[in-house]
């Protein structure tokens, strides 16, 4: 991570940290870095979610792009993966999404996609940061015909919807409940599932700029759970603010998280011989029950650090086609280059329809182990050195020995705060409490701060 760019672009409180001035500079410098080797007029696609600050930041960002001679295609409200898809299929120079994903409405963010539809490499982000920190802006300042032009491109949404529908099958007779989080999916999910002939019910479809992710969506699926039971739906599908993740609800109102969704889709692909190298890419936070289910069905796994960008890196390097996170980011590389909630939802319902199995039956193939996570405040200089403390290393080794292979311990530093995270999984809640609390007590004694 750099000074401005985090693991998912530039984020902050809109108009306080992520200001219009910064958005203008990101448009100007980001547009230049991503298009400097173009021979013709560069084209950049820009979209946003439904936050009240979106149009303010969009205007500033677009002005920056236009100031370096870029032709800007304004997509309006669109899911993040829609930008990625359109950039790649329409041969654009780059794409920019204005969103803070699952964060509350006061936050916003700006993330770039290269011409290949993938998020930027670290060296490209550092190049943009160097321009942001330079004492003087020395980039070209074209005038007259050298300036960029602005094109409204509402047909981008239709093209993305058509693509999504093309990946699915007829869902006639299936009751589907949708929660679009008052976010980007609110402009597309209804149309997509109606085109697939599903019988739908929808909540979270009235964005007002302030209610995105507010007690709704993939991080707050409680209302969707109620809707599924009220309507007798076969499945509930909850997206986040920019629709790059999915959390599902089965016909009984129970949550089906990213681990289970990945397993269901992965097993289906594996049985058809379509799972590349018969491998699913996951992160260290995936549940032990997910790993055991993969082992039982002869499916391989590749494990990365936390963050969908690391999952994508591993997928690209090793040519895997399915990966994701417990949080609901699922990347299906045969179709798109980033997590896509609506695409994942379509593939999940396809498996249900083709197998004739209910979602609860499909999800029951993975037994999720109880999990507990405790955050312990430590000196920032010590959070990366915890395993070098003899007492901490010893207690972890002792707890792992007691588990006898039927549990898991993960101790890792926070990426942004002076915290050490202690996580354990085991067959019962009592065992999880014992393992986590025992380790946490030693960590607090050795390196904890008040």
From Swiss-Prot:
What residues make up the catalytic site?
A: 101
Q: Where is the signal peptide?
A: none
**What GO biological process terms are annotated to this protein in UniProt?**
carbohydrate metabolic process; peptidoglycan biosynthetic process; UDP-N-acetylglucosamine biosynthetic process
The answer to whether UniProt assigns keyword Phosphoprotein to this entry is yes
Sorted alphabetically, which Pfam families does this protein's record hold?
PGM_PMM_I, PGM_PMM_II, PGM_PMM_III, PGM_PMM_IV
Tell me its cofactors.
Mg(2+)
E.C. numbers: 5.4.2.10
Which cysteines share a disulfide bond?
A: none
Q: What is catalysed by this protein? A: alpha-D-glucosamine 1-phosphate = D-glucosamine 6-phosphate
GO CC annotations, alphabetized: cytosol
UniProt keywords (A-Z) are:
Isomerase, Magnesium, Metal-binding, Phosphoprotein
Q: How is it modified after translation?
A: Activated by phosphorylation.
What is the protein's known function?
Catalyzes the conversion of glucosamine-6-phosphate to glucosamine-1-phosphate.
UniProt similarity note: Belongs to the phosphohexose mutase family.
Q: Which PANTHER family match?
A: PHOSPHOGLUCOMUTASE (ALPHA-D-GLUCOSE-1,6-BISPHOSPHATE-DEPENDENT), PHOSPHOHEXOSE MUTASE
Q: What is this protein called?
A: Phosphoglucosamine mutase
Instruction: Look up and give the organism this protein is from.
Output: Streptococcus uberis (strain ATCC BAA-854 / 0140J)
């Amino acid at each position: 991570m750099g000074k401005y760019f985090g693991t998912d672009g530039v984020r902050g409180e809109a108009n306080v940290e992520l200001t219009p001035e910064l958005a203008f500079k990101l448009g100007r410098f980001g547009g230049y870095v991503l298009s400097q080797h173009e021979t013709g007029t560069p084209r950049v696609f820009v979209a946003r979610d439904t936050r009240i600050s979106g149009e303010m930041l969009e205007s500033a960002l677009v002005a920056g792009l236009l100031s370096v001679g870029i032709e800007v295609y304004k997509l309006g409200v669109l899911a993040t993966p829609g930008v990625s898809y359109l950039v790649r299929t329409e041969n654009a120079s780059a794409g920019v999404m204005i969103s803070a994903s699952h964060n509350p409405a006061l936050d916003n963010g700006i993330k770039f996609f290269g011409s290949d539809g993938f998020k930027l490499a670290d060296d490209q982000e550092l190049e943009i940061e160097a321009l942001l920190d330079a004492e003087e802006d020395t980039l070209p300042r074209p005038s007259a015909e050298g300036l960029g032009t602005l094109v409204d491109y509402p047909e981008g949404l239709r093209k993305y919807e058509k693509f999504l529908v093309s990946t699915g099958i007829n869902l006639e007779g299936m009751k589907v409940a949708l929660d679009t989080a008052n976010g980007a999916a609110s402009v597309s999910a209804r149309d997509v599932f109606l085109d697939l002939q599903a019988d739908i019910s929808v909540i979270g479809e009235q964005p007002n700029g302030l209610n995105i992710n507010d007690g709704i969506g993939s991080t707050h699926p409680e209302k969707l759970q109620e809707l599924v039971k009220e309507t007798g739906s076969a499945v509930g599908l909850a997206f986040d603010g920019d629709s790059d993740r999915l959390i599902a609800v089965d016909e009984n109102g129970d949550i089906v998280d990213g681990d289970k969704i990945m397993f269901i889709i992965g097993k289906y692909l594996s049985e058809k011989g379509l799972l590349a190298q018969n491998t699913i890419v996951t992160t260290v936070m995936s549940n032990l029950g997910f790993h055991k289910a993969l082992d039982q069905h002869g499916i391989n796994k590749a494990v990365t650090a936390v963050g969908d960008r690391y999952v994508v890196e591993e997928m690209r390097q090793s040519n895997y086609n399915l990966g994701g996170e417990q949080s609901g980011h699922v990347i299906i590389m045969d179709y798109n280059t980033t997590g896509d909630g609506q695409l994942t939802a379509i593939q999940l319902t396809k498996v249900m329809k083709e197998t004739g199995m209910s979602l609860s039956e499909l999800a029951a193939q993975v037994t999720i182990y109880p999990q507990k996570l405790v955050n312990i405040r430590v000196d920032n200089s010590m959070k990366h050195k915890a395993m070098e403390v003899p007492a901490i290393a010893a207690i972890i080794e002792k707890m792992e020995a007691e588990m006898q292979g039927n549990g898991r311990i993960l101790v890792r530093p926070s990426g942004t705060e002076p915290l050490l995270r202690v996580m354990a999984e085991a067959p019962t809640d009592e065992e999880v409490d014992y393992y986590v609390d025992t380790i946490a007590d030693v960590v607090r004694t050795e390196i904890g701060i008040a």
